[in-house]
């Protein structure tokens, strides 16, 4: 069964309470034949992989974006200004088909400048370099001020992109 599970990487979109709820909403809306797209961030690494070495837990990054991913890169891009810098977004879409009926989309925004090379030991990285880490991890450690600020930047980036996408589609 392991070889079957490894044939298609799980994007972890339905993991956790909110992720599962969002996936169910998108699927149900499509099944009912209603239009209703979702918006989020295109995190490069999802929930961490738990490894054990010498009877000690080690957290490793868990990349879910592979060459055969369901992500479709679009030509849509927006500028998101912050106080001291501006980030350029890249929009990816995932089709969410309903049961025997419609299909909606999950829109996932990424940054052009994300750098997986900044990952150090396991899942540690410089949380202050927003341009390089904004969409790096689904659940960055926010137990310190840098992590809390990163979460605020992530939320602002997502909301700004979502608003710009809605306005673009309303034209």
Model-flagged regions — what are they?
Residues 1-171:
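A conserved ligand/cofactor-binding region detector
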């Amino acid at each position: 069964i392991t070889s079957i599970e490894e044939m298609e990487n799980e994007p972890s979109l339905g993991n956790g309470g909110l992720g599962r709820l969002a996936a169910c909403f998108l699927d149900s809306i499509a099944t009912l034949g209603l239009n209703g797209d979702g918006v989020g961030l295109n995190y490069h690494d999802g929930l961490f992989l738990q490894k054990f070495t010498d009877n000690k837990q080690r957290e490793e990054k868990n990349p879910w974006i592979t060459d055969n991913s369901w992500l479709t890169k679009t030509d849509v891009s927006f500028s998101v200004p912050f106080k001291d810098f501006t980030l350029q977004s890249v929009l990816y879409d995932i089709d969410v088909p309903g049961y025997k009926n419609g299909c909606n989309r999950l829109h996932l925004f990424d940054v052009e400048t994300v750098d997986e090379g900044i990952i150090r030991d396991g899942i540690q990285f410089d949380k202050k370099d927003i341009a390089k880490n904004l969409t790096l991890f689904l659940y960055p450690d926010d137990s310190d001020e840098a992590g809390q600020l990163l979460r605020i930047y992530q939320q602002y980036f997502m909301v700004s992109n979502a608003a710009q996408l809605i306005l673009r589609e309303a034209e």
